[in-house]
């Protein structure tokens, strides 16, 4: 394990029905004007919007709405939110939703405090990070991304045709109340849970390859995610399984699993590039790419793929490379078992030219066991059409 320094800023409120406790504790710290940020109409249809707004207003807060945050949030939406925050002198941002809402607000939080363009700042020659931000907190209604746990955000720049990470504010607190996920469509729940599994795999497959304490914690979380996805499919009202998946999502992205490692995340970077051109569902894209990408790195990644096969999928027979291959087969079978797609055509992506552009614009990650070329990434995308 490599050396590291660790300090973690996000306060966690976890548990069934913990929303009121969390907000009552945090509202006195929010200032007078709170921007309530959310996605579409489901928050209002479920009654959660009125519930949260009434609590804020009862505490004397002026509430400013920022709505319509889409899946795969755009940079234009970030600018819209920053404008609303500036014009209304917002003191605090309360993001209510899943990863897209929370990611968007992390960047709104810093863009609202500077006249400089955040994208140009972080991807320009100087590669500077903004330091001033509007404080924010998150109420999670769709787990899987772990977005509430860190300051990274994935934003689509439609003008540049890029879907890339930006870095903004940390949440001062996160509310993980499994009751708030009950109205979410099962397809979305499973997609989010697979994203959690992907985060774990992408961290596990990083460097150094030898297994350490954080890898062993990771193996336990992966087993837990697999078990609880199956439990939730068998019984969608299984609140225990929902809570377990919510906490697994948090654990996958609160940096614990990444201590002492350089993470892989080549699959994520490739999916982000495809998403910039197709606006595909993130979890679905990951499910399509993972098995084929791993087969392309069976030689270079055999040690960790074999360890994952044995310690996560229970495969004990065969040579290291044979176990690695069987583990990838087990992953692919699980993807089919839980109803996730395994081909781009299943989600309406059929344009090979777009996949070529996506491959060519993909960030090549230093933590991956294999140093892929853009041409080989394109071959992976073609094999999964």
Language model feature labels by segment:
Residues 51-52, 82, 101-115, 149-152:
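Short Gly/Thr/Asp-enriched flexible loops that form oxyanion-binding sites at enzyme active sites
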Residues 1-92:
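ATP/NTP phosphate-donor binding region
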Residues 19-22, 45-48, 75-78, 100-105, ...:
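Short glycine/serine/threonine-rich phosphate/pyrophosphate-binding segments
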Residues 113-213, 307:
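A glycine/threonine-rich phosphate-anchoring loop and its flanking beta-alpha core
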Residues 305, 312-385:
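C-terminal charged capping/lid subdomain of soluble metabolic enzymes
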Residues 90-106, 141-147, 277-280:
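Glycine/serine-rich anion-binding loops at beta->alpha junctions
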Residues 203, 207-330:
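Active-site segments that bind and position negatively charged phosphate/pyrophosphate groups
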């Amino acid at each position: 394990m490599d050396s590291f320094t660790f300090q973690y800023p996000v306060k966690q409120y976890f548990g069934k029905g913990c929303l009121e406790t969390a907000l009552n504790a945090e509202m006195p710290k929010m200032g007078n004007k709170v921007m309530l940020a959310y996605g579409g109409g489901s928050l209002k249809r479920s009654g959660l919007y009125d519930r949260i707004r009434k609590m804020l207003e009862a505490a004397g807060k002026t509430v400013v709405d920022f709505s319509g945050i889409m899946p795969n949030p755009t940079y234009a939406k970030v600018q819209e939110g920053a404008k609303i925050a500036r014009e209304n002198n917002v003191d605090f941002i309360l993001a209510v939703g899943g990863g897209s809402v929370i990611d968007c607000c992390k960047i709104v939080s810093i863009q609202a405090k500077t006249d400089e363009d955040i994208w140009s700042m972080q991807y320009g020659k100087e590669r500077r990070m903004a330091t001033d931000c509007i404080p924010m907190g998150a109420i999670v209604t769709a787990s899987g991304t772990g977005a509430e746990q860190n300051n990274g955000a994935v934003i689509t720049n439609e003008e540049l045709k890029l879907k890339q990470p930006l870095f903004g504010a940390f949440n001062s607190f996160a509310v993980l109340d499994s009751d708030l996920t009950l109205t979410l469509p099962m397809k979305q729940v499973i997609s989010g849970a697979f994203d959690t599994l992907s985060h774990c795999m992408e961290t596990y497959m990083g460097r150094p390859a030898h297994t350490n304490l954080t890898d062993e914690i990771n193996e336990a979380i992966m087993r837990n995610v697999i078990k609880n996805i199956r439990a939730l499919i068998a019984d969608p009202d299984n609140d225990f399984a929902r809570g377990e998946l919510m906490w697994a999502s948090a654990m996958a992205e609160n940096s614990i699993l990444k201590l002492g490692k350089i993470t892989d995340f080549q699959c994520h970077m490739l999916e982000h590039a495809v998403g910039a051109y197709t606006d595909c569902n993130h979890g679905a894209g990951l499910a399509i790419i993972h098995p084929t990408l791993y087969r392309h790195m069976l030689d270079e990644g055999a040690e960790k793929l074999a360890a994952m096969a044995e310690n996560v999928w229970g495969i004990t027979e065969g040579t290291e490379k044979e176990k690695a291959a069987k583990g990838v087969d087990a992953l692919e079978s699980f993807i089919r078992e839980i109803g996730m797609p395994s081909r781009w055509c299943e989600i309406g992506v059929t344009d090979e030219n777009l996949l070529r552009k996506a491959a060519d614009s993909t960030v090549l990650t230093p933590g991956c066991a294999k140093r892929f070329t853009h041409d080989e990434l394109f071959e992976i995308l073609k094999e999964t059409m």
